[in-house]
Amino acid sequence: MDFFRVVENQQPPATMPLNVSFTNRNYDLDYDSVQPYFYCDEEENFYQQQQQSELQPPAPSEDIWKKFELLPTPPLSPSRRSGLCSPSYVAVTPFSLRGDNDGGGGSFSTADQLEMVTELLGGDMVNQSFICDPDDETFIKNIIIQDCMWSGFSAAAKLVSEKLASYQAARKDSGSPNPARGHSVCSTSSLYLQDLSAAASECIDPSVVFPYPLNDSSSPKSCASQDSSAFSPSSDSLLSSTESSPQGSPEPLVLHEETPPTTSSDSEEEQEDEEEIDVVSVEKRQAPGKRSESGSPSAGGHSKPPHSPLVLKRCHVSTHQHNYAAPPSTRKDYPAAKRVKLDSVRVLRQISNNRKCTSPRSSDTEENVKRRTHNVLERQRRNELKRSFFALRDQIPELENNEKAPKVVILKKATAYILSVQAEEQKLISEEDLLRKRREQLKHKLEQLRNSCA
């Protein structure tokens, strides 16, 4: 199956269009066929008026894109991948994955060819490059470049072509034996830096896309200047590393693709991410030795802080529960400063008391024994009270056979029964007194009769 091969050409990049299957067209004229539907006056030239003013019209009815207005997309940053050299344009020709030696294709492996084809076809270059030619003079003044949906395609298309050109240059430099490798590496690094500065200068000016002034922290210009300043110190490090490296080193000096340069803004963002939590505080243990990042030579002296394991600490949270049964407090209202001091002292006292009052095992066992003894005695008392009620119920004639009689009924019936028994007792006592008197009388009469008979 045939794909595409990247071939270097010595012509300047301005002569090569981004897509060979589409011709250069000015798509501003495509709106002329539907212009009467958008404007009342057919003779009005809307795009010319906007290009002269270089500002968006104030009336929403004059611009259909005003309804979809969003913040413009900033231009893409220059590529940081390895092996970028002097600018050269990319021609697209069919080739096969067999790796023939003709045409310089034998130096590419299958994985490299697939990666180049993926980057060529996967970057939406066809969808982005057919709109208009970026080398055209009217490209910067085009109305589509100021729209939020089309403002980022030009820089992406240029960077795709530069990426494809860089792969072949890097492979040729690494594949061909060169006795003066240190000199070639120095020239490659210097060309790489020049290409980065050229790519940054060829990006779209943000003032064209978004003419209104922004803050220093959010303006795209400041981002571009930060990028250029981040790349500027890397040239010294690259040159110094090439001078210190031996001549016979088999590996050329290239920048790592997956490691972006670390700047001071990255370290500041990582420091801002370390926040404290109220109950569980997260702390980072600092390593004894500072570890510098040797993987990316474009760090420019900034070292990334090492990632250390997180340590969770439990903090004491004092909870104060209100005692509703206590009488209202009569303390005086202290000032705010004194109240804060007293509260802090009280909290510290509670913490110290909680630490000190760790009860020994002996006191715990004694409390358990006391509690068990109290439970046993309470159970015995309840059982005795129940048995006494049952005995009282059995003494009452009305409740003698009623096993489900409640305690209140038992007490009432027992009280009535006691009163009746006491009344009967008084009656019997009075009868006994009468009988005693009768007996005394009879005794006295019998004594008289006996004396008379004698």
Curated annotation (Swiss-Prot):
Phosphorylated by PRKDC. Phosphorylation at Ser-344 by PIM2 leads to the stabilization of MYC. Phosphorylation at Ser-77 by CDK2 prevents Ras-induced senescence. Phosphorylated at Ser-77 by DYRK2; this primes the protein for subsequent phosphorylation by GSK3B at Thr-73. Phosphorylation at Thr-73 and Ser-77 by GSK3 is required for ubiquitination and degradation by the proteasome. Dephosphorylation at multiple sites by the PNUTS-PP1 complex promotes MYC stability by preventing ubiquitination by the SCF(FBXW7) complex. Residues 369-382 are annotated as: Basic motif. Pfam families: HLH, Myc-LZ, Myc_N. The modification Phosphoserine is found at residues 21, 77, 86, 96, 166, 174, 176, 308, 329, 344, 359, 362-363. This is Myc proto-oncogene protein. Residues 281-293 have a biased composition (Basic and acidic residues). The gene is MYC. Efficient DNA binding requires dimerization with another bHLH protein. Binds DNA as a heterodimer with MAX. Interacts with TAF1C and SPAG9. Interacts with PARP10. Interacts with KDM5A and KDM5B. Interacts (when phosphorylated at Thr-73 and Ser-77) with FBXW7. Interacts with PIM2. Interacts with RIOX1. The heterodimer MYC:MAX interacts with ABI1; the interaction may enhance MYC:MAX transcriptional activity. Interacts with TRIM6. Interacts with NPM1; the binary complex is recruited to the promoter of MYC target genes and enhances their transcription.
